[in-house]
C-alpha cells in the first residue's frame, strides 16, 4: 500500500473511484468535474495505491469557518471518501483519512468537518457529531399575513454585497458557519442552467435584516436553501412572503439553528420540526486550534488538558492551556492533568455544542481538578455550533 497526494493526471483516476462509489458508474461525471474545476485551487486529494492502482481517496477542501464574531479559522472540509469494493475492509480508506489529517496539519488547517455516511465509521478516526439543528416544514395555508411583508422585495445583482454582509453578521453568532468565497455564493444565488434562483430581502431603514433564497422545488414541497433573519420582524416578514406562495407551493422546508425563534413568532399543530445533528467536526491540531480561538476577554484561567488521539498522535499528551484578555497560549506539560478527554469530546467542546457541562454530564470527560475544570468551561464558553452548508 502506498499513500500520496495526487498530482497532475492522477487526479483523473479519482473519477473512476468516485463514480463507482457515488454515481453508479456514470462515465461523464459532469457535475463532479465542473465543481472540481471551480475549487481545484483550494483542494487536495489523498490517494491509496496498491499493485492494481488507485484504490481509495479522500478529498479535502481548504475553507474557513466562523467561530463567533471575531474568529475565522481554516477548516478542512472532507469529502470524496471512497474505496473500490474489492479492497474494502483492508484499511485503505482509513489510511487515506489519516494521511489527510497529516496533510491538513502540514498546511496549517487546524480543524475539519465532514458529512458522514456513517457516524460510527468517522468517529473511529477522531471526528464527532457537533451542533444540532432544526429542519422546519411549514404548510403555506397556515401562515399569516404580516404588514412587515410590504418591506420585502426581490433581490437584484446589486444586492449581493448587502446579502453577504447580512450573512456574515448572522454567522458571527455561531461556531461553524462557513466564511463563504465567491464560488460558494455563486452556487447559492446564481441561476442554474435549468432553473431560476429566487431571492427575497427584508429591508428597513437601509439595513438588510434578513433574506431567503430557493431554486426549483415542487408543488408538494419546496426546499429553501437559506432562510436567515437577524431580527424578529424580518422573520415575520419573510414568513408572510411564503404565505403568498400558497397557490404554487403546499409546504416549504428549510434548516435553522437550534436557537431559531420560529416558535415565538408562529406556532401551529401542522408545523413539523425535526431536531438532528448538524455535522461532524474534528480538531486536527490541538495547539493550533486552541490558539486560534478567542475566549471572552473577561475570562482567564489555566487548565492542564490530557488529550487522547489515536489517529493524530501529535495531539496525544497533556497540554498547559492558559488564557486571558481573549488570547490563548498552549504548550506541552508533564504536570498532572486537570481534565482528561479524547479528541472526539475535545472537538465537541471546541465547536460549542455539546457544551463542556453537557460532556461532563454524559461522562465524556474525566475531571481530576475542579479548578481546572472551571477554567475549561470558561475557555470554551460562547456561541453554539451551526452550519448551513454541505460539501
Residue ranges with predicted function:
Residues 47, 53-63, 75-77, 82, ...:
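Conserved beta-strand in the GNAT
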Residues 106-110, 115-134, 259-275:
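Conserved active-site alpha-helix within GNAT-family acetyltransferase domains
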Residues 87-99, 233-237:
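Conserved acetyl-CoA pyrophosphate-binding loop and the N-cap/start of the following alpha-helix
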Residues 64-72, 138, 218-226:
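A short, polar/charged loop-to-alpha-helix boundary motif
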Residues 36-56, 77, 187-201, 299-301:
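A short helix-loop-beta-strand connector motif used in the catalytic cores of GNAT acetyltransferases and
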Residues 14, 21-47, 55-79:
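N-terminal, Lys/Arg-enriched amphipathic/low-complexity engagement segments
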Amino acid at each position: 500500500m502506498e499513500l500520496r497526494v495526487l498530482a497532475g493526471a492522477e487526479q483523473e483516476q479519482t473519477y473512476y473511484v468516485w463514480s463507482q462509489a457515488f454515481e453508479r458508474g456514470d462515465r461523464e461525471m459532469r457535475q463532479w468535474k465542473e465543481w472540481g474545476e471551480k475549487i481545484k485551487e483550494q483542494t487536495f486529494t489523498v490517494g491509496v495505491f496498491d499493485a492494481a492502482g488507485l484504490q481509495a481517496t479522500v478529498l479535502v477542501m481548504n475553507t474557513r469557518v466562523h467561530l463567533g464574531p471575531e474568529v475565522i479559522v481554516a477548516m478542512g472540509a472532507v469529502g470524496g471518501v471512497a474505496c473500490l469494493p474489492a479492497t474494502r475492509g483492508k484499511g485503505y480508506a482509513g489510511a487515506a483519512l489519516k494521511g489527510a489529517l497529516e496533510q491538513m496539519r502540514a498546511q496549517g488547517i487546524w480543524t475539519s468537518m465532514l458529512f458522514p455516511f456513517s457516524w460510527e465509521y468517522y468517529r473511529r478516526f477522531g471526528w464527532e457529531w457537533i451542533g444540532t439543528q432544526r429542519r422546519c416544514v411549514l404548510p403555506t395555508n397556515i401562515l399569516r399575513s404580516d404588514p412587515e411583508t410590504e418591506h420585502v422585495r426581490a433581490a437584484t445583482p446589486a444586492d449581493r454585497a448587502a446579502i453577504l454582509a447580512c450573512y456574515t453578521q448572522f454567522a458571527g453568532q455561531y461556531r461553524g458557519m462557513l466564511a463563504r468565497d465567491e464560488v460558494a455564493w455563486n452556487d447559492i444565488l446564481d441561476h442554474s442552467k435549468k432553473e431560476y434562483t429566487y431571492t427575497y430581502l427584508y429591508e428597513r431603514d437601509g439595513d438588510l435584516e434578513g433574506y431567503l433564497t430557493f431554486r426549483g422545488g415542487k408543488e408538494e414541497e419546496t426546499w429553501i436553501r437559506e432562510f436567515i433573519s437577524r431580527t424578529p420582524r424580518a422573520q415575520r416578514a419573510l414568513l408572510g412572503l411564503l404565505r403568498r406562495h400558497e397557490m404554487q407551493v403546499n409546504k416549504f422546508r428549510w434548516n435553522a439553528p437550534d436557537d431559531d425563534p420560529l416558535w415565538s413568532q408562529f406556532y401551529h399543530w401542522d408545523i413539523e420540526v425535526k431536531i438532528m445533528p448538524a455535522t461532524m467536526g474534528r480538531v486536527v491540531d490541538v495547539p493550533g486550534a486552541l490558539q486560534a480561538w478567542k475566549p471572552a476577554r473577561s475570562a482567564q484561567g489555566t487548565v492542564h488538558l490530557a488529550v487522547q488521539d489515536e489517529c493524530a498522535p501529535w495531539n496525544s499528551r497533556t497540554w498547559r492551556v492558559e488564557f486571558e484578555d481573549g488570547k490563548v497560549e498552549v504548550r506541552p506539560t508533564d504536570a498532572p492533568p486537570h481534565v482528561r478527554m479524547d479528541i472526539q469530546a475535545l472537538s465537541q467542546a471546541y465547536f460549542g455544542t455539546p457544551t463542556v457541562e453537557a460532556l461532563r454530564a454524559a461522562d465524556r470527560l474525566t475531571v481530576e481538578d475542579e479548578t481546572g475544570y472551571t477554567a475549561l468551561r470558561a475557555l470554551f464558553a460562547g456561541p453554539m455550533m451551526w452550519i448551513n452548508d454541505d460539501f
